[in-house]
């Protein structure tokens, strides 16, 4: 092991979180994994320790449960783990139109992608202030720059925009205290997330030139976070789209989004 520092990664059992664990471990960081699937976490922790000669621990938690952030933080404190990097990566999808979703599902969606991020971030910001430094990776989305799309995207984009603003607020308020937050905003990334959430047909419809490999996304995200970058968007096309969304007049952007969603905006 190169050091005694740990990286805490939520949503670590698959997809981007799985690759992030490998990227950090390959750089000598010890890892704390958390997700809902104990079998996958156990297998991944063994794999990381064997391959990279680091320490890897895991705590099973469902971030749709409002008590989960406190339980995860308590686990780290009880095991005296020096967490120097927090990765807010856990995901949640709703494969239904907005008018068809039930309140329980919406509550879980908002808790996983919003409330749990706030609570985990606050717990570890307090620790980072004591230790004098810390880094936070906010795994957001390219969707955070654009107006909400149709279906599940009506909620997804706005929540990810909130995550970005929270990351910005961390930098504004705590950068002078040694704490940085990096908003990682990938576009279409090839993972098992879309299959598991019943949206593989939507992913298949995306042109291949718009898709990014999950390993390259994870590698770039880790490098950006370690450098303390405020925002990182992978790939030229995604960067260009993010730029357009930032400079295009809001009314025009909404009209274009409405057309793409099959609707109209007058």
Where are the model-predicted features located?
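Conserved glycine-rich cofactor-binding loop
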Residues: 13-15
């Amino acid at each position: 092991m190169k050091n005694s520092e740990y990286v805490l990664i939520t949503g670590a059992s698959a997809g981007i979180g799985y690759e992030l664990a490998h990227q950090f471990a390959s750089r000598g960081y010890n890892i704390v994994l958390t997700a809902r699937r104990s079998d996958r976490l156990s297998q991944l922790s063994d794999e990381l320790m064997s391959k990279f000669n680091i320490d890897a621990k895991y705590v099973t938690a469902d971030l749709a449960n409002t008590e989960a952030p406190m339980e995860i933080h308590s686990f780290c404190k009880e095991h005296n783990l020096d967490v120097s990097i927090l990765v807010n990566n856990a995901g949640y999808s709703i494969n239904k139109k907005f008018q068809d979703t039930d309140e329980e599902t919406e509550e879980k969606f908002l808790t996983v992608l919003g409330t749990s991020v706030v609570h985990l971030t606050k717990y570890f910001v307090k620790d980072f202030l004591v230790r004098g430094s810390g880094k936070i990776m906010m795994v957001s989305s390219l969707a955070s720059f654009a107006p909400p799309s149709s279906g599940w995207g009506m909620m997804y984009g706005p929540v990810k925009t909130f995550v970005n603003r929270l990351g910005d607020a961390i930098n504004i308020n705590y950068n002078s205290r040694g704490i940085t937050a990096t908003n990682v905003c990938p576009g279409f990334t090839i993972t098992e997330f879309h299959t598991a959430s019943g949206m593989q047909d939507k992913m298949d419809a995306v042109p291949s030139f718009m898709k990014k490999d999950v390993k390259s996304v994870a590698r770039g995200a880790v490098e950006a976070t370690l450098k303390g970058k405020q925002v990182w968007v992978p790939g030229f096309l995604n960067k260009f789209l993010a730029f357009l969304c930032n400079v295009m007049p809001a009314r025009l952007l909404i009209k274009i989004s409405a057309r793409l969603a099959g609707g109209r905006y007058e």
